[in-house]
Each structure stands twice: as structure tokens, then as C-alpha cells.
């Protein structure tokens, strides 16, 4: 099946700054070697000339250094990203991939400011993430400094095993993936008739609701995040549409449809009446919630498919959708 976007996941981190000058937060690093490296740069001052002017900082009151650095929504502007990162630190912005993290990348990669490994290490020493991640970054930056590294692809996500950072790096990765996925969808639908495009838009409104509800309620999130599940569904949608556009359309007999529907219903009833009532983070109630939304989703898909692929019978679409839904259940039932 397929699934889509939604994810308003909390961004967390401990960042403390004064309004005029950077006040480095407490380090979580316990590794002796990394602590020694941090001690060697503790008196390093970040370049005063790199900070925004008062007028610039006022204009940057609602800026996002990540958006400016990576070019989300507009052309990348690393110089403005650098000034924004300082502004974020001054206003105690708690976005995890922002402020210090972006500034560390700017000084390491030499994008938006003169390369400055000592400044990058000083920032890395006080990011306040997982101790292992923080120490790993310090070691990595120290190696790059000794190698006179001249690359531009260092990332805070190079070390992101701590849950919060891992989650935010997954969201960051999805932002890049979305650009590529949307481009492919636009290319795929470019030649569609206006009525087909309109039907697809209507379907996607329901699809997005289902993908969000399914990721929250129908997936065991003990070893994953909602955003990762949504990415799985989104990519699956694109793959399915690409196959359909190649002419690889579902073709089920009446008997195959009956079997698929029976299997889907049996799996669902097992979640409601079987001996188990909980599967990790999934409960009977959460399954009911996702099932209710899936039924709306199935109807929305069939309405779209009736317009776009009129040669495929409704029983074939239902069999295809039922088979996919059974697979969703089996992910946690087996």
C-alpha cells in the first residue's frame, strides 16, 4: 500500500545564550579524550565579525538557519544561515538542528564563513545531545582538522544515535526526499487529464489523513518513528503509481477478491477478538481507529482509480487494497 506525510514531532535540545554574546551550554561529554579536546578550545572566541548586526538580527527574528543552509523553500544562502544561526542562539531557539548545530556545520564545511575547526569543535562540545554522539563529533572534527580537510559535506547527523537527534535527522532526510518524490510525482502526473489530476488531489487529502493515523496507531513504534513509517507509505505510493503508469495494473478474479477480503477481515478480527490485546505501542483501540480511517482511504482510492484507470474493476482494486491492509496487520501480528 502506500502512505504519506504528517509529522509534528517535538524538537528538543538544551541551548542557553545571552542576547549579546554566546554563552556555551553544559557539555554532556564524558569521554576523556573528547573532554581533553574540548578543554583545548574552551578559550576560543567565535568570530565577532560573523555575527549579524543589530538590524540584521531584528530582521532575522523568525528565521530558520536549517532552511537557509539547506535551501528548503528558497535558494540556499549559507551566509544568511550563519547570521540566522547566531540569532537563533541569542533568542534561545531550541530547534535541535539549528543554531549551534548549523553553525558547527558552517565552520566545518567553510560554507557561509571561513572554515574554522576550532570554532566548530567548541560548538560541538556543547551541543547537549547524547554523550556518545557529542564525543563522536568532537573526535571527527579533530581528525578533519589534522587532515586539513577541505570538503563540504560534514553533517551533525553523522553522529545521531541518540533518539531525539536520530528522529530529527530522519525528519531532515525526509525533507530532502520529499523534494525528489514530489518532482517525480509531478513528472508522472504532468500529462494526466485535468479530471484525473483533480481526482488524485481529492484522494491525496484522504491519503494523508490515513497515513498519519496509521503511523500513529497501526504501527509498533518501539523501534521506529512515525516519520519513518510515513516515509515508507509515501515511497510505496510513488512506486505503485509508477507501476500502474507502466500498465502493471491489478487484475484479480472474483474468487481472489473474496479470499483477499476474507484474509483482511480475519486479520482485523484477530486484533479485536484474539488472545492478545496489545502489540508494543499498538492497542485494540488504536487498531480500530486506523481501521476506520483505512475504510475511508479505500473508498477514496477506488473513487480516484475509477476516474484514472477505468479499465480496472472495482473488485480488483478492493482485492489489491485488502491484500495490502492484511500486510499491515501481519507486520505486528506475526
Q: Over which residues does each language-model region extend?
A:
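A broad, structure-centric signal for solvent-exposed, well-ordered loop/edge residues
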Residues: 10-11, 16-17, 120
Amino acid at each position: 500500500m502506500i502512505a504519506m506525510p504528517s509529522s509534528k514531532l517535538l524538537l528538543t535540545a538544551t541551548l542557553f545564550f545571552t542576547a549579546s554574546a554566546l554563552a556555551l551550554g553544559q557539555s554532556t561529554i564524558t569521554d576523556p579524550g573528547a573532554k581533553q579536546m574540548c578543554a583545548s578550545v574552551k578559550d576560543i572566541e567565535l568570530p565577532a565579525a560573523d555575527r549579524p548586526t543589530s538590524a540584521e538580527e531584528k530582521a532575522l527574528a523568525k528565521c530558520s538557519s536549517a532552511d537557509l543552509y539547506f535551501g528548503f523553500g528558497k535558494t540556499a544562502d549559507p551566509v544568511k544561515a550563519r547570521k540566522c544561526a547566531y540569532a537563533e542562539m541569542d533568542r534561545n531557539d531550541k530547534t535541535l538542528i539549528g543554531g549551534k548545530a548549523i553553525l558547527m556545520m558552517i565552520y566545518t564545511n567553510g560554507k557561509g564563513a571561513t572554515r574554522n575547526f576550532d570554532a566548530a569543535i567548541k560548538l560541538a562540545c556543547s551541543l547537549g545531545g547524547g554523550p556518545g554522539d557529542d564525543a563522536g563529533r568532537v573526535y571527527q572534527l579533530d581528525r578533519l582538522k589534522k587532515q586539513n580537510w577541505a570538503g563540504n559535506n560534514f553533517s551533525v547527523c553523522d553522529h545521531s544515535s541518540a533518539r531525539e537527534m536520530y528522529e530529527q535527522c530522519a525528519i531532515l532526510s525526509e525533507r530532502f526526499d520529499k523534494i525528489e518524490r514530489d518532482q517525480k510525482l509531478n513528472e508522472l502526473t504532468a500529462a494526466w487529464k485535468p479530471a484525473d489530476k483533480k481526482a488524485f488531489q481529492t484522494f491525496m487529502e484522504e491519503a494523508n489523513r490515513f497515513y498519519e493515523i496509521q503511523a500513529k496507531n497501526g504501527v509498533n513504534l518501539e523501534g521506529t518513528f512515525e516519520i519513518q513509517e510515513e516515509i515508507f507509505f509515501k515511497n510505496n505510493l510513488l512506486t505503485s503509481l509508477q507501476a500502474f503508469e507502466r500498465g502493471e495494473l491489478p487484475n484479480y478474479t472474483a474468487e481472489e477478491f473474496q479470499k483477499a477480503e476474507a484474509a483482511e477481515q480475519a486479520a482485523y478480527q484477530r486484533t479485536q477478538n484474539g488472545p492478545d490485546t496489545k502489540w508494543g505501542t499498538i492497542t485494540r483501540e488504536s487498531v480500530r481507529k486506523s481501521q476506520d480511517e483505512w475504510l475511508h482511504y479505500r473508498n477514496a482510492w477506488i473513487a480516484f482509480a475509477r476516474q484514472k484507470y477505468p479499465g480496472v474493476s472495482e473488485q480488483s482494486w478492493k482485492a489489491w487494497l485488502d491484500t495490502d491492509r492484511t500486510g499491515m496487520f501481519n507486520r505486528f501480528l506475526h
